Amino acid sequence: MSRERASFGSKIGMILATAGGAVGLGNVWRFPYMVGQNGGAAFIIVYVACVLLLGIPCMVSEFIIGRHGAANTYRAYSEVGNGRPWKFVGFLGVMTGVLITGYYAVVSGWCLQYVYASALGQLRGETSFVKSYFQSFSTDPVRPVFWLVAILLLAHYVIIHGIRGGIEKASKVLMPALFILLLVIVVASCMLPDAGKGIDFLFKPDFSKFDRGVFLGALGQSFYSLSIAMGCICTYASYYSRQTNLLGSAVQISFIDTMVAILAGLMIFPAAFSVGINPGSGASLVFLTLPNVFNQAFAGMPLLGWVVSLMFYLLLSLAALTSLISLHEVGTAFFYEELHISRRKGAAIVTASTMAVGVLCSLSLGAWSSLQIAGRSLFDVFDFVTGQIFLPVGGFLTCVFLGWFVPKKLVKDEFTNWGTLSSRLFPVFLFLVRFVCPVAILCIFMHQLDVI
């Protein structure tokens, strides 16, 4: 079945869609904490350096493969590699994207539940109450499944309407809405008493905390935050025009992703320190600590506290949804192009399969908690396999593939838009992809496995 390749209709739509794929829950619940615990501004400086030396070159590599291949991730690697075994790196990206969609939908569903709970004022109470609420909800066999199905159906609705009518159109609404919500909460948080302590925690440089662990943490964050090796960057790039400046786009997307993460810190820490709470990281920060932070910080203004809490979880849901849409598209493009079926049928396959994975992961935290593999719940197994094995392996092989096996002329033509853009930075890019990025990703991989 021959079909004309879809494409983004505008540069702003392309940037917002790809940035939406990069911006996710990790920007809110991991990056700010890492900044505060690892030297503040000192960590940010190291992180930005890692983005420049690792994140952006890896992203441009996927852009080149995706745009040149002009197909789903699996076929793009095959096209660029002339059908050689490297196409299985593309298939690894597809499989990783689909698996992440399944368990990521579980946490995304929790965000929707908290929007609902915030709207009804159900999160007002001490930390012990909120912890009990989360424990009861997350282990329930029905409610988490309902919400994960709901958010997957939202992503499905966007996907079936195509690139311009679905993904691009939705991104032009969701991403500005995310920024507006973020800025409003930042302003409200920074106006609280003792907010300056939280700002100092986030930005005051403390080079005494800098060590190997801080460097490796910044390195890993720069890799994961930009959604490298998940298939979505390569898939979205297949819809880019020949006029798109790949390096410039990667810089813009990385800037947006980093700004969201820093603003998230300005949203969380001033409020937390105003009530004397040193927030942790991960899901416990979002679902256990912050409801109580909002309750205490705005105790004298209950209506404002209700609004801020509602807006925060709506913000989280938008960030989760934009990521889910990009991950969903990875599998959808693969199925409808490889099986020669309609986009709607391809999307239906992905939605059904990821719902199945999501339901299994959700139940493994409650009713089926006894079902474990190597002492891990199914949720943790999917998280470990995709995050600590598939992603670094896929990123490493992508750099080796583009740096050493793809013809240099092809890479340079894509990098410079066939000579219409400056080639001054091309030798630097190629050096980073060939030597720096593979070593950096190996360090991330070994650090996660506690080898270094």
Where are these regions (language model features)?
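Membrane-interface "cap" regions at the ends of multi-pass membrane proteins
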Residues: 1-29, 56-63, 67-80, 84-91, ...
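Membrane-embedded translocation segments of transport machinery
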Residues: 2-8, 168, 172-321, 345-346
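Inter-helical loop and helix-membrane interface segments of multi-pass membrane transporters/permeases
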Residues: 2-7, 33-38, 68, 73-92, ...
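Hydrophobic, membrane-embedded alpha-helices of multi-pass small-molecule transporters
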Residues: 9, 16-26, 97-101, 105, ...
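Transmembrane helix-boundary motif of multi-pass solute transporters/channels
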Residues: 10-48, 237, 248-251, 255-258, ...
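Membrane-water interface regions at transmembrane-helix termini and the short interhelical loops
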Residues: 34-38, 85-101, 135, 150-174, ...
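Hydrophobic alpha-helical segments of multi-pass membrane transport proteins
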Residues: 320-326, 347-365, 380-414
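A generic transmembrane alpha-helix motif of multi-pass inner-membrane proteins
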Residues: 377-401, 422-452
